[in-house]
Every structure is written in structure tokens, then in C-alpha cells.
């Protein structure tokens, strides 16, 4: 058994954004404007990126490049034509309630503070909804047209954006024991903790109009990887604990859907925390395994009878 305090957790939600009457919207500019509309007394535009290294892998090495580095280079090239500094483009805000609100590529992203109870987490997630909606209303007035936000995970054209969960775990827990214990759970969790959509998609394309119970599963093709934007993995290995790296790791879960229902959020995060606690209590325990976790994803997400 690995001694540990209660598991801390949090949620990062990227919102889809659109404006009525504008087909070819500059979503980056719109996202920047929306986030900056949250500027008011007590809100500061600052963030320390020094400890962030998206190339650092939980398995013990640094990858030379990410699959999304090409996209990042394109974003950087586009951003050089904006009359804004890097800090102004990111518009990283630390809110008074401990949340982080910023422009992540082409999406406004709201990150809850670290929470120790499900009630606290749900309250912060709902507070995030109110913050982004208040910003949308302000921006709509400024634009003279309705700015719409979508708490979902796809544009139905083969592009997905995330609702990520974070769980603070002791570094003493071996990575291979963590992944062996949680792998089958993350696949089967899709059955009861996702939001669903009426579409089947692939990278950069819409495939067919059929219902499935998960929004994100169409976009996962790897078992483990440090990437988050292309060839997404079932288990993300990015090692950015935002804490003392000698003691802690941040288990970054990227396969979940954004939930509107507080009950669904409780179920998603609560069951995950229980599984993680079970792993911490007995890391050597033999947890259930799937012969082919990636093959199981399309089976469970497209079942409407829960019998796959």
C-alpha cells in the first residue's frame, strides 16, 4: 500500500465557439476576445510557463517532437501576423476562485482549481459554465451578434477538442502498475460516463450520421503517448505535475467527454478516483485486462444496448 492523502482532481474544458452570421470565423481571434472579456478588477493576465514541458514523458524520457508540433508551427506562423504579443494571444487569466481561463489554440479553455471532493469539483465546473457564458454575453453585445459556446467535444467535421481530467498521484506508484490497473476501466467507462453524439467521425472528416454513446472515442488510436492533439492515446503520458516532481505525478486523462449533467461529472471523476485509490492501496493486485483495448473502444461507443 502506498500512503497518500485524498486524491486531488480537476477538469479542463475546451469550448467550441461560433458567431451567428459568420461562416468563416477567425476562431482564434474570437477565442482571445472572449477570454479577455473576463478582464475585471481582481483578474490578472499572467501564467508561469517555466515548469511546463509537453515533451516530457511519464515513462522516463523526453520525446524529440510531438505529432502536433507541425500544427503548433502553423499556429505560430499565423500568430506572427496578429498585432498581439504571445501573452496577449494566450490571454492566460488566473481567476479569483483559483481557476485558469485562457485561449488554447482556437478554443476558450476553463480549468477548475484543484478539488478534494466531488461536490467542490461540480460547483467549480458549473461556475466555469457561468463564467464563459457571461463572457459570451459581453462579447455578443460588443459584436452586435450572438456568440455561441458549445460544451461538447467535436465540430462534426472530424476535429475534436478536449475535456481533460487531472488526478494528483504519488510518484512512488510505478507507472506500469498505474496503467495496468486503469486501462480496462478507462475503456469501459465510456459506456456510462460520456455525453454521446449523432455522428461517426475520423480525423478531419465526417463519416456517417449514426448515434454513439461517446464523443471522443473516434479520435483515439494509440495505447500510450505523450500527444494530445493527433493520434491520441488511451493513456496520456505527459509528465507535468504542477507540483514537486520528486513526489507527485499528474495523471492526465484525455479520453472523457464534456458533461452538462453534474451527476455525470460526479460519476466520471468519482469512479476514476475510486479505481486510482484501489491501485494505490494494492499496486500488485491483478486488475482486469482487455485483450485489445483500442479495438474495444468502437465496440462499446457504438452500442446502444450496452451488451458489447
PLM-predicted stretches and their roles:
Residues 115-117, 154-156, 172, 218-219, ...:
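Short, solvent-exposed loop/turn segments at secondary-structure junctions
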Residues 164, 171, 220-223, 252-254:
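The feature captures the catalytic groove of carbohydrate-active enzymes
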Residues 153-170:
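Histidine-centered divalent-metal-coordination microenvironment in nucleic-acid enzymes
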Residues 20, 170-172:
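Short coil/turn motifs at secondary-structure junctions
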Amino acid at each position: 500500500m502506498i500512503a497518500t492523502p485524498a486524491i486531488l482532481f480537476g477538469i479542463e474544458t475546451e469550448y467550441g465557439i461560433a458567431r451567428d452570421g459568420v461562416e468563416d470565423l477567425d476562431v482564434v481571434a474570437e477565442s482571445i476576445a472572449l477570454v479577455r472579456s473576463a478582464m475585471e478588477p481582481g483578474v490578472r493576465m499572467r501564467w508561469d510557463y517555466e515548469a511546463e514541458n509537453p515533451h516530457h514523458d511519464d515513462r522516463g524520457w523526453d520525446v524529440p517532437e510531438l505529432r502536433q508540433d507541425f500544427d503548433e508551427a502553423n499556429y505560430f506562423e499565423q500568430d506572427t501576423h496578429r498585432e498581439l504579443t504571445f501573452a496577449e494571444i494566450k490571454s492566460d487569466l488566473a481567476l479569483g476562485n483559483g481557476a485558469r481561463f485562457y485561449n488554447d489554440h482556437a478554443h476558450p479553455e476553463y480549468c477548475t482549481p484543484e478539488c478534494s471532493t466531488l461536490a467542490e469539483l461540480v460547483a467549480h465546473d458549473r461556475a466555469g459554465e457561468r463564467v464563459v457564458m457571461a463572457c459570451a454575453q459581453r462579447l455578443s453585445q460588443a459584436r452586435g451578434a450572438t456568440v455561441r459556446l458549445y460544451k461538447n467535444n467535436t465540430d462534426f467535421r472530424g476535429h475534436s477538442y478536449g475535456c481533460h481530467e487531472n488526478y494528483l498521484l504519488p510518484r512512488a506508484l510505478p507507472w506500469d502498475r498505474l496503467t495496468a490497473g486503469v486501462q480496462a476501466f478507462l475503456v469501459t467507462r465510456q459506456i456510462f460516463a460520456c455525453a454521446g453524439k449523432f455522428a461517426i467521425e475520423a480525423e478531419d472528416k465526417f463519416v456517417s450520421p449514426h448515434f454513439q454513446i461517446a464523443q471522443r472515442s473516434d479520435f483515439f488510436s494509440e495505447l500510450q503517448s505523450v500527444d494530445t492533439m493527433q493520434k491520441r492515446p488511451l493513456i496520456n503520458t505527459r509528465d507535468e505535475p504542477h507540483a514537486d516532481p520528486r513526489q507527485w505525478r499528474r495523471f492526465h486523462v484525455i479520453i472523457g467527454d464534456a458533461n452538462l449533467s453534474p451527476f455525470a461529472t460526479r460519476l466520471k471523476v468519482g469512479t476514476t478516483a475510486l479505481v486510482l485509490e484501489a491501485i494505490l492501496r494494492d499496486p500488485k493486485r491483478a486488475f482486469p485486462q482487455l485483450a485489445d483495448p483500442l479495438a474495444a473502444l468502437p465496440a462499446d461507443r457504438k452500442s446502444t444496448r450496452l451488451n458489447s
